[in-house]
Design a protein with these regions (language model features):
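Short gly/ser/thr-rich secondary-structure transition/capping motifs
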Residues: 37-44, 113-115, 136, 166-170
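Short, hinge-like loop/turn segments at secondary-structure boundaries
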Residues: 104-107, 127, 150-152, 172-175
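Conserved small/polar residues in nucleotide/adenosyl-binding loops
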Residues: 178-184
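Nucleotide-sugar donor phosphate/pyrophosphate-binding loop at the beta->alpha transition
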Residues: 115-121, 160-177
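N-terminal signal-anchor transmembrane helix
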Residues: 23-84, 88-100
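Active-site proximal beta-strand in glycosyltransferases
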Residues: 131, 147-160
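Membrane-embedded segments
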Residues: 66-143
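A transmembrane-helix-recognition feature enriched in membrane-embedded lipid enzymes
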Residues: 2-39, 175
């Protein structure tokens, strides 16, 4: 019941907040060059060419330019050691441009879906990731729930969390973070 109530309230508040800020978001995206394909991808709508993507990819979620730079280093090392392919999801036009310009073979760069109910799941159904790596400690409830429902393990890199924040995450772990390990150290 607690998880349902949290999810219900979160989705109402997030959707209302999203609708209120949408005009300024669209203006900002247009100015920064992320308006075209990026907006469709934020709704989980991908170009036809993505239909040919291999399934079972590593999904790396990096929001800003700094996180993308770290994610690119991680992906180069991961793919050199293990091979395969990956999806790098970014949230900003500048982060997206940085990721695209790196041109790492086997890495598809997409815009991360909004955390609106159903959109993260649509993305995961499209790319069928084997695992998700979050750069930094940015957790979105619908994103985490969609991963949990699909049995996709999640890990964080470069995440620092205070004891206070950790206790808050653990207090809400019944909501959607039960499959995310929060190591101490």
């Amino acid at each position: 019941m607690k998880a349902f109530l949290f999810s219900f309230c979160y989705n109402i508040l997030y959707t209302v907040g999203w609708l209120v800020t949408l005009p300024s978001y669209l203006l900002k995206q247009k100015r920064r060059g992320g308006f075209g394909t990026g907006l469709l991808e934020r709704f989980g709508l991908y170009r036809v060419s993505y239909n040919r993507e291999p399934k079972g990819v590593l999904y790396v979620h990096a929001v800003s330019v700094g996180e993308v730079v770290l994610a690119l280093k991680f992906l180069r090392a991961w793919l050199r050691e293990r091979g395969g392919s990956a999806v790098l999801a970014t949230s900003t036009a500048t982060g997206h441009a940085t990721a695209v310009s790196a041109q790492i073979p086997g890495v598809r760069v997409i815009y991360a879906p909004f955390d609106l109910l159903g959109l993260p799941g649509r993305c995961f159904d499209r790319f069928e990731p084997e695992a998700i790596v979050l750069v930094e400690a940015e957790l979105w409830p619908n994103f985490a729930r969609a991963a949990k429902v699909r049995g996709i393990p999640m890990a964080m890199i470069n995440a620092r969390m205070s004891a206070r924040s950790e206790s808050r995450y653990r207090a809400f772990k019944s909501v959607s973070y039960t499959h995310l390990t929060l190591p101490t150290n």
